[in-house]
Amino acid sequence: MTIKHLVLSGGGAGGFTLYGALKHMHNNEFFSFENIESIHASSAGSIIGGFLLLTQNWNDLDNYILKRPWDKLINISPTAILSLWQKKGIFDIEMIKEIFKPFLKSMDYNENITLKQLFQKTNIDFYCYTTNLNSDILETVSISYHTHPDLELCKAICMSSAFPMMFEPIC
């Protein structure tokens, strides 16, 4: 059986478990990147899905995850805590951009690459899912190059992983 579609769930720190499971499955030939046609993801899964779209080298990903000086990126200042009520989150889209910048540069992609441009380069449909909190009812929004072709990859990932109070919502 050939796996053509990956579905990556959210779950915050569970994203590390998901990463390990995907790596194990790939290394044991349960799936091959060459056969992947689409990635459907939410929250932490969208971050991992973004990594997989930009590099398919597990050693590069391992080195990045383990050796990046995360303390320099994740700096929670007293100002961020005090502005939490107004901004509704400690981190914003700039953090997501900083996380993905090395991979975008290594692929020679613009850091503002759109979902349509990414599809044209990878030929993989990338779907991020988010919830619209501004509607009368909570509605799930599917984000892909089919529905939002001009949306930047980092913005789509940020929208999907906008955990309340951690990341500022994107309207």
Where are these regions (language model features)?
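Patatin-like phospholipase
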Residues: 1-42, 50-171
